């Protein structure tokens, strides 16, 4: 226990691990080998729902738990940018970093695959977060999301300060920045 909080062990299950009658929180498995188990989370509250993918690739289990969610928070890795970084690291002889850039492409989802999953799951809004590499300028953001809007147009590329509000008893999704 720290600062009055008690750690609990969470096991993925069809049933919520927390349910107070209003808020239900469900943990589910995602694919992030070599790290296993890895979890995603679904929060259901008074008719609204948010899903956090955690680090993962496209999977049927994530698709199942994202079904009809108001908002899907999806981590994303730009395969294009990362593969360029990998080649740059190789060209300067930094084999360690080049290997990392190569390996991470196997256990993170691309923005386009995230968009495909959101569309198939009938998600209302997709928020890309935990971005690799984080696009720090608008041109990089355009490269990061290239082709996404052709698959799923209702998305946000989050940064520090992105604020998402789902008013209860509503279908509205409010996206703003607190910066």
Stretches found by the model and what they are:
Residues 2-67, 163-179:
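Core dinuclear metal-dependent hydrolase active-site scaffold
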Residues 40, 49, 57-160:
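Cap/insert and terminal regions of metallo-dependent hydrolase folds
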